[in-house]
């Protein structure tokens, strides 16, 4: 346990940030699952809406360095390839 006041504050701040980051990463994973499930079910209506929403979220959190920008673009690229294959 921290004894110095500033280190106590820092540990509290890091715990808050850890909870925030984990919730946002969980949200990202759930949006990716939502898109993948709609791809598996071949629901063309929901695929576009959920994919656009997922792209926006990935870009937002890549910009804030919550996930790496290359990971965000890789996820978007892989899912867009699957979507293009369905719409053929």
From Swiss-Prot:
The keyword Ribosomal protein applies. Belongs to the bacterial ribosomal protein bS20 family. InterPro entries: Ribosomal_bS20 (IPR002583), Ribosomal_bS20_sf (IPR036510). Pfam families: Ribosomal_S20p (PF01649). Binds directly to 16S ribosomal RNA. GO terms for biological process: translation. Residues 1-22 have a biased composition (Basic residues). It comes from Wigglesworthia glossinidia brevipalpis. One of its GO terms (molecular function) is structural constituent of ribosome. Keywords: Ribonucleoprotein, Ribosomal protein, RNA-binding, rRNA-binding. It comes from the Bacteria. This is Small ribosomal subunit protein bS20. The keyword Cell inner membrane does not apply.
